Regions:
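Acidic/His-rich structured neighborhood in mature extracellular/periplasmic domains
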Residues: 2-197, 201
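Pan-zinc metallopeptidase signature
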Residues: 197-221
Length: 221
């Protein structure tokens, strides 16, 4: 019986991975097309070629411990923690950090601007679309002065809180705007059909079925 259950688990994981790959391809194509429709192609300003190519992977993401000073709103340091922390674990970590005379908060990551980008597999459809655009813009900006200075801030080589705030704000605005356009164009009738599911949480298979309707169009290109 344990061997049979293990095989079933592997089968389900393989099926989910295959479905996730389709979701990633479809959403990446939709976001890229929408960016192009807004005249956003590449940071080099040469030709209508999208760069860097928009690619992301859906997976469970870790939490982050954000440490700030007590007297002002500013992130002093961010420490990546392991995945699947319980609420008790998070509160214990925060309490330990606070005893050092700082303000701390453990938050979940929605996405990471690695390449390909990593996006939380537990997020809803619209959040996934917005995050895909958000993280891509970070990659786009890395080839511009503001983005390069942000990379220096992230690596600790030249810390600049204002640059970090500007970069995140810009990526956030573009992510929401492009995400809204994509959602309106491709999924305008989606919300009514899944309102009940949204009340209880993210339903991967239900959202997968909706996205799957557009797969053939992209595979034919």
């Amino acid at each position: 019986a344990p061997f049979q259950l293990e095989n079933e688990l592997y089968g389900l994981q393989a099926k989910q991975a295959a479905q996730a790959a389709i979701v990633e391809k479809v959403i990446a194509g939709q976001v890229t097309a929408t960016l192009a429709g807004q005249g956003i192609f590449n940071p080099l300003g040469k030709g209508k070629v999208s760069f860097p190519p928009l690619m992301f992977k859906l997976q469970e993401l870790p939490s982050v411990l954000v440490i700030s000073p007590l007297d002002r709103i500013e992130s002093m340091r961010e420490i990546v923690l392991k995945q699947s922390l319980t609420l008790e674990n998070k509160e214990s970590i925060e309490a330990g950090a606070d005893r050092l005379g700082v303000s701390s908060l453990v938050v979940g990551l929605g996405g990471m601007a690695t390449y390909p980008s990593l996006i939380d597999s537990g997020a809803g459809l619209q959040a996934t679309i917005e995050t895909a655009a958000h993280e891509w813009l970070h990659q786009y900006l890395a080839f511009t002065p503001i983005g390069f200075r942000y990379l220096l801030d992230l690596t600790g080589l030249s810390q600049n809180y204002d640059i970090a705030t500007m970069n995140e704000s810009l990526a956030g605005m573009v992510g929401k705007e492009i995400g809204a356009l994509v959602y309106q164009k491709y999924y305008s009738g989606y919300e009514d059909g899944v309102s009940q599911v949204q009340q209880t949480g993210f339903d991967f298979n239900a959202e997968m079925r909706e996205i799957r309707k557009t797969v053939d169009v992209y595979l034919a290109k």
